[in-house]
Structures are given as structure tokens and as C-alpha cells.
Amino acid sequence: MLSQEDNELLTRVGPGTPMGTLMRRFWMPVLLSKEIAEPDCPPVRVRLLGEPLIAFRDTNGRVGVVDEHCPHRRSSLFFGRNEECGIRCIYHGWKFDVNGNCLDMPSEPADSNYKTKVRLTAYPTHEAAGVIFAYMGPPELQGEPPRFEWRGLPAQQQYASRWIQDCNYAQCVEGEIDSAHVSFLHSLVNKRDDNKAALAGAYFAGDRAPKWKVVDTDYGMVLGARRRTEEGRYYWRMNQWYFPFYTMIAPVPGEARSFRMWVPSDNTHCSIICVSYRMDQPVSAAEVNAWQKGLNSHAAVVPGTLRPVANSGNDYLIDREMQRTESYSGIVGVRAQDAAMVESAGPIVDRSLEHLGTSDTAVIRMRRLLLRAARDLQQGIEPKAATNGGLYAVRSHSTVIDEDGDFDTYPDIMAAMRV
């Protein structure tokens, strides 16, 4: 249960809100490089923390993330001409570079210096491993981008996709870090599945009430969930939550790692970027094919859009016969299953009506950390992780141990999570 006041604080991310101000201290994932793949390609609309923006790649390959609306008469630059190192408004020809400088005002007298007095809101950008980030906070507080494990990987070793969910970012993240639901939502019916890649393997099916151990860190928290195995051993799954909305779920042995970014478009929509990768070899064509079909880590989208094929408008393509005989949910794909649960709670869930239990330990802790960080910032206390990219050089991990001990008491487990 969360009070209405705290729920508002947690979920409102627009300009001037405490949570929006906190998030603007961090580098924000905006879109994928392949969405603006070529110099002078058409601009792309993006919405970030309630701000309507466009992203474009100029003639020299530089990326701009700028206000969608021309400062002249506020017409949309989405319709603009991306040419000769700038985006030109087609209304009166005003042209701006990736830094927001006005390069040309052909509708003004030739001897006018007015263009030196007008700027377009523009945000610094950073591009890494196929993802474009923007920094929207105070310039003097801009820190280094986060050093995620996958940041320097070549293209053949990673695959990235983006899609939109129709709800607030917080409930998206809560659905991701909740390990207890795996034993139900992603499970099979009347069938034993030892293929843990389906998230319904013996460890999850055998112990459906995991023991939680959450460890706070400077970057966020490690979320440990322990399950008993049939052999009398203990399966620990350590997932990561990083400020302010990043997650990494521990992969099953042999599977690629996946890292997700739950970026608030506004109060009621979330842009999700998922990067799946392998550190030591290229991802396979079969893996990419499965990801594109939305079978596990990624969502299948309607071609030419960011809208998932399985969505609220078609009840996530639920198959009641499959639900009766094969799948606990009747919905195909982990992403679609999760989306059905978090979106069906409403655009912004009323958390004052919840009844939380021990299985919600990670959810409760994440809310407290975000609320505390937002309130601290209002008192002038800056978030540590915002300027220290090295804090993000950690990964998720899973293992089986013989003793019933907490994961953080084992040096080898803690070492395995460091990049």
C-alpha cells in the first residue's frame, strides 16, 4: 500500500515534478541508433519525461535530440528538412543544428542578427552500442554516461529493440523485478518444463514462494530470490535494479543476457529498450528470430510502429484453450504476459488499494529508494549514481549452492556480479 501523496510523487515525471527532476539528473535512453540510421534521414518523434522531442542525425552523423516545436511559431519540426547539418522548419525556413543554434532565418532581413538571439532547446547526446542517450539536467551537473557491460560490444554480439507500454514506468519496473510471479505467470500447465529458457524450469516450478534478500547499493539494489531445489540445494537468482529505471534479470545457463531500460515517455506511457547480448560470441540468427517474434526477452511489434502485436486492444491475443491445457496465462511470450498484468492495472495504478505481501519485498524497496532520492534532491542532496558511470559496471547472476546461506555472504557470488 502506498499513500496517494507518495503515489503521485512516484509516478509524476513531467518538468518541475520531484521525480522528473530526479530523473533529469541521469542520462536518459531515448531511442535506438537504427531508428535514425543514416545522415540526413527523416527525424523521429520521441517523448521523454513529458517533453515532446525529435531526434535526428545530421549530415556529419551527429545526433540531435531537440524540442519538437520550432521556437518561431511552435510548428512541429518533425515535418522539417534534415539537410546540410541542421533541421529546417518548413514553415518559414528557420534552421537549427544539433546543439540548438539557429543557423539560418531566411524569412528575416539579410542584415538581421536575430538568429543569434534565438535558440532551440537541445540536449547533449551520447551514443553507445546502438542506443542513443540524452542528458536533460543542469549542464554543470552532467556526469559520465553509465558504463553498462554491453556498452562497448560490436554490433554482431548484441541485439536491441524498443517498444511502448501504455502505463506508468513504475509499474513496468515493478513487474520486472518481482521474481515471485515467474512461478505462475510464465509457467506451464500439466507439463514439466526443464528448459529454463522458457522461465518455467524446475527451480521456478518447485518452489513458488522464494525467500528474499535485498541489498542496497550506491547504484540501486541487488534483488536476491532463493528457491529450494528438489535435490535439497538452494537456487539463488540475483537480479539488478539500477537508478532510476534500469533492470537486469539473471539469465539461465547458456542464454544471452538481457538488459532493459524502462524510460518514462510521460506519466502514462513507458518506452522500453531491451539490449540482449553475448560477451564472448555473436548472437545467433535463431536468437534474433525468437526475439523479433516476441517469444522471450523482446516484444514483437507491428511493423513500422512501436506498438506490440499483442496489446490491450486485442487482449494480448489470449488463447483460452491454450490456457486450459498448456500455458498458465494463455498468452504467448514473456513480454506480452508481463504487459497484460501491468497495463491491466490501469495507466497509473492506485497503490492505496494494494495488499502487499512478503513476495513484494523488491517492489516495496524500489519505491522507497526512489521516493527517498526524489525527496533528498528537493533538499539539495544529489543522487550518487547520476554522475558516476562506473557504478553501473555490474551484472545479474544465478547459481546453485549447497548451504542455506544468504548470497551476499559468498565472495565468489559477489565477484561474479562485478564486470
Regions found by a protein language model. Give the residues of each.
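C-terminal catalytic domain of Rieske-type non-heme iron oxygenases
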Residues: 15, 37-38, 62, 133, ...
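Short, functionally important structural connectors and interaction interfaces within domains
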Residues: 14-15, 22, 69, 74, ...
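Rieske [2Fe-2S] iron-sulfur-binding domain
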Residues: 1, 31-159, 211, 222, ...
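A boundary/linker detector
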Residues: 1-24, 31
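A short, structural micro-pattern
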Residues: 24, 119, 126-128, 256, ...
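Alpha-helical interaction segments
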Residues: 16-17, 81, 86, 306
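Short, charge-rich amphipathic segments
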Residues: 4, 18-22, 102-114, 294-309
